[in-house]
Amino acid sequence: MATATLMPSNGKVLSTKDGTVVFSPAGTNYEMHLNSPAFAGPLDSPVKGIVRVKPKKIWTVPSGGLFISPIFGPPKTIQGRIRSLDEEQMVIHAGGSIVVELPEDANLYDLANGPLRVGAMVNVTAFRGATFEMVR
């Protein structure tokens, strides 16, 4: 399986303040507020980066669109298709690639629509504190 570093999100960092960047994935209107205390890259220019979230809950869902909510602010709900999966993380395509750490607690999964697998549609509710790491 491809690792998260081989599936970065393309987009632009629109601004940075107090260790937080505003990242807009290419082809979207999203403006995700992400922790990135060490960011020293360009503003408003194309960049590649890894967006990471820690889940409160992961569901497999039968259908639906690819989205990140809210459109402006820290990502709270992410729904998309699994592009890559291993025992520690999965990469979801949802208007950009989002790396989701897989929790050990089985109570955090609701797999009513089948197991986690590449190509499956999932919905993730994320904790605050999503991060951005630029890939050079």
Describe the predicted segments one by one:
Residues V22-P25, M90-A94:
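SH3/SH3-like beta-barrel fold
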Residues M1-K17, S69-V91:
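Structural detector for short beta-strands of small beta-barrel domains
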Residues M32, I58, Q89-V91, E133:
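Intrinsically disordered, low-complexity acidic/polar segments
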Residues T20, Q89, M121:
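Exposed beta-strand and adjacent loop surfaces of beta-rich binding modules
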Residues N10-K12, G41-I58, P115-R136:
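Flexible glycine-rich surface loops and low-complexity tracts that mediate binding to linear polymers
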Residues A26-P42, S97-V118:
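Beta-strand/loop nucleic-acid-binding surfaces
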Residues K17-G73:
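Acidic (E/D-rich), amphipathic helical modules within compact regulatory domains
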Residues W59, G65-S69, V100, L108-D110, ...:
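Generic alpha-helical propensity signal that fires on short helical segments
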